[in-house]
Amino acid sequence: MKSKVNFLKSLIPLFLVTYVCSDSFDNNFYNNHGSVGLINIPTARFFNEEVHGITIYDGTPDQKITLTSNPYDWFEASFFYPNIQGKPYPGFEYQDYKDKGFNLKVRLKKEGQLPAVAIGLNDFAGTGFYSSEYVVTSYGVRNI
């Protein structure tokens, strides 16, 4: 019984750090592309203004480093540089494919009684390997 109590006590700092971090970022997370979203899906949520981040994604077949900036609470811009394994770089037999690109996201409507609405462009200035355009809505239920 004492070992279970000690184990639960050891989890308290973890829960405190999680609470503080999630509260300071309004429950937003970076997705695989380095922008606010869930896994590989963008959301209409944004970090507070003047929040900047660096993300490193190590998946298969691609790895990606992304620099993201939120100069305003309604605008997000990011620059990414991926390495795609198994796809040869043109003219180099033993080199993986490299790319670069930029992402933009702009909020059109803030969340209230209706969902937040944003539009975005992925990889609009690169080779277009990750290219996409989207309109997305997000609505939080009970601050989730």
Please describe what each predicted stretch is.
Residues T137:
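Conserved, mostly hydrophobic/aromatic
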